């Protein structure tokens, strides 16, 4: 273990397509702990930006407003010596991503780390691993990890210790909602067309699941948080992971596909930022379950930002430093 300060407080941001997430953590020589978590809507694809491949002015404004709120939380928490923002699909795929990164740096003084999809999948794996959910794997068994995002969906196959396969697919729900424009409730033909399209785009994943035969499916954060809140009526908040009974997931899907936005907003734990996308998320999850046939499905409350904290903590323990963009 390298020489280090006895304490360091860091802030990690996950700048997603629909939501910006903040996690503040304290590093001590023998452990780390979470101090503060905050999230707010950002809608980087607003105004048709996903379809045009650009972060449009309305999205710039929304993102800056979200970052202002996040920076206020960081300042109010105090003692943060490092801020590490990770940007994912909406920023990395935008033609004007460099312009966005420069604008954020100029206004807030933070340097955004725009990460590729495979790196995103790696951090998601580390976050899910930190949740402890892999204790449900027996020796020789594998798990399929899935993170449903706004711009992309990440998949990882793991034995609980190492990554056997990882891939990011540009099939995020904000992207799919633009592609499959429909009036509510979603019609059977549109639902089948959506499932068929996703199935064809995931051919490589199906080959890998046939090869590694994962026995459990773990969905992280985002849509799976909403699934958990629906099934458990917003209970079990303190648990880093929970099992989502397959029969209840199926029943929930049947409710979702028949619902309209006003009905979904009355459902337990429904976030306004997810109300337009949760139907497709549910259909996508059912497609994966049908194809993979896991014996159990779990929700992990830990994902990219928790994985980033775990990784930065290990670096701090080994080297005594975390990163270059210190405040």
Question: What are the roles of these predicted feature ranges?
Answer:
Residues 20, 32, 153, 163-164:
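Hydrophobic residues embedded in beta-strands of well-ordered beta-sheets
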Residues 7-10, 24-27, 45-80, 90-142, ...:
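Helical "lid/coupling" subdomains associated with nucleotide-phosphate turnover
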Residues 3-23, 32:
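N-terminal amphipathic/basic leader segments beginning at the initiator methionine
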Residues 17-19, 128, 149-155, 222:
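Ser/Thr-glycine-rich phosphate-binding loops at phosphate-binding pockets of nucleotides
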């Amino acid at each position: 273990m390298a020489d280090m300060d006895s304490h360091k407080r860091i802030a990690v941001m996950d700048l997603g397509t629909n939501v910006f997430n903040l996690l503040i953590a304290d590093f001590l020589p023998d452990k780390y702990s979470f101090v503060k978590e905050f999230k707010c809507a950002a809608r980087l694809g607003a105004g048709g930006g996903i379809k045009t491949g650009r972060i449009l002015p309305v999205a710039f404004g929304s993102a800056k407003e979200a970052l202002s709120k996040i920076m206020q939380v960081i300042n109010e928490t105090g003692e943060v010596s490092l801020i590490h923002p990770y940007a994912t699909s909406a920023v990395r795929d935008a033609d004007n991503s460099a312009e966005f990164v420069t604008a954020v740096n100029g206004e807030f003084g933070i340097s955004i780390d725009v990460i590729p999809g495979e790196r995103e999948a790696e951090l998601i794996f580390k976050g899910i691993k930190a949740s402890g959910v892999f204790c449900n794997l027996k020796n020789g068994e594998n798990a399929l990890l899935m993170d449903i995002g706004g711009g992309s969906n990440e998949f990882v196959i793991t034995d609980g210790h190492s990554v056997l396969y990882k891939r990011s697919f540009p099939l995020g729900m904000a992207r799919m909602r633009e592609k499959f424009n429909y009036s509510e409730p979603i019609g059977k033909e549109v639902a089948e067309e959506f499932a068929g399209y996703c199935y064809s785009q995931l051919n490589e994943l199906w080959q890998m699941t046939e090869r590694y035969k994962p026995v459990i499916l773990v969905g992280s954060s985002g849509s799976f948080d909403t699934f958990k809140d629906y099934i458990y009526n917003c209970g079990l908040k303190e648990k880093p992971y929970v099992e989502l009974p397959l029969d209840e997931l199926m029943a929930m899907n049947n409710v979702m596909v028949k619902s309209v936005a006003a009905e979904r907003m009355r459902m337990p734990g429904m976030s306004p930022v997810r109300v337009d996308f949760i139907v497709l998320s549910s259909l996508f999850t059912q497609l994966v379950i049908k194809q993979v046939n896991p014996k159990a499905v779990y929700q992990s409350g830990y994902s990219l930002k928790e994985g980033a904290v775990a990784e930065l903590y290990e670096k701090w323990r080994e080297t005594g430093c975390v990163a270059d963009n210190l405040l």
